Amino acid sequence: MSEGDLAVMKPETMKSYIWLQTADGSIQQVEQEVAMFCPMICQEVIQKGVGSSKNHAISLPQRVNPAMFSLILDYCRFHQLPGRSNKERKTYDERFIRMDTKRLCELTSAADSLQLKPLVDLTSRALARIIEGKNPEEIREIFHLPDDLTEEEKLEPLKNSMDDPRIRLLNRLYAKKRKELKERERLKNVEVEEHVDERSVDDLLSFINGRDHKAVKMSKGKKKKKKKKDQKIVSSNNIHDKESHDLRSKQQCVEEIGSSMREVPNLLSAEDDISTPNAGSEDEDIDDEIDPAMRELLDREVEDFAQRLNSNWVRSLGKERRPVHFSINGNGTTRRHTGMVSIWRPCMFTLF
């Protein structure tokens, strides 16, 4: 375009620009009529006279980042043009706010810092529809907000300047919950006081050194009890073993006596034969053949057996039996008085 063409161009056809600097330090050149749609920028240009050059760019608020500022400029370009119908504006606004919750919050904050009230109202209504019907926990989850309020702060009474009955009922509910919370805190403090350590300094020192004084005493007591219990068990086992040994010895003695007594009928039947002269001569012949030392040994054994038989028979069997009395003749034979039974031959058979 030549200089002559620029000279004949009307002033209204030439666009003027304003220099704006965003939060990240980048500088943009924006049409004046679009930038002036934001009240904050308009005040800076009129009151301070800045923005006419790159060296005197208008610094935008910290909350206005390049991405949000680009969206705001698109909104201003559409709405600052005359001749738009309300239906067109409404359709554009509905499409414009279709974004995620995080970006919608950032856009609301940036529009508020630029004092662009129509855009603030639009984004605020969109956020209101998102949180409608949600409880506090769900709202904190949607906006990723930390729960930094204590239970008491959550239950603080609400201001009711208009005397709303719903707020009155809500404050009553909060008062009841605060009372329950205080009661739980009181019970918790009581439990903590009950668990206070009341041990002496010596016990604490013992615990710090690695051994608890009470635990040591308890362990010693347990060891003593265990030792006594083991001694009782050992003594009872010894008594039981002794009784078993005595019982076995008695049973063995009874068996010996019984085996001896089974020979008594045979001895009784042979009593008459033994008392005859011929039998006596036979015994005398046998006695003559036995060595005198052996005969004396046999006589002592027979006498010991007779004494043991008379003393243990009745006690071991537990029955009353008629004792059998034996005597030893001068020739080494044994005979029974009062029913004289000679047991010389059985004794000889048993010993040999």
Swiss-Prot record:
Residues 214-251, 267-288 are annotated as: Disordered. Disulfide bonds: none annotated. Residues 239-249 have a biased composition (Basic and acidic residues). The keyword Glycosyltransferase does not apply. GO terms for biological process: auxin-activated signaling pathway; jasmonic acid mediated signaling pathway; protein ubiquitination; response to auxin; response to jasmonic acid; ubiquitin-dependent protein catabolic process. One of its GO terms (cellular component) is SCF ubiquitin ligase complex. Keywords: Nucleus, Ubl conjugation pathway. Residues 108-167 are annotated as: Interaction with the F-box domain of F-box proteins. InterPro entries: SKP1, SKP1-like, SKP1-like_dim_sf, SKP1/BTB/POZ_sf, Skp1_comp_dimer. Expressed in young seedlings, roots, leaves, floral stems, inflorescences, and siliques. Residues 216-230 have a biased composition (Basic residues). Its main location: nucleus. Pathway: Protein modification; protein ubiquitination. It is found in: Nucleus. Involved in ubiquitination and subsequent proteasomal degradation of target proteins. Together with CUL1, RBX1 and a F-box protein, it forms a SCF E3 ubiquitin ligase complex. The functional specificity of this complex depends on the type of F-box protein. In the SCF complex, it serves as an adapter that links the F-box protein to CUL1. Part of a SCF (SKP1-cullin-F-box) protein ligase complex. This is SKP1-like protein 20.
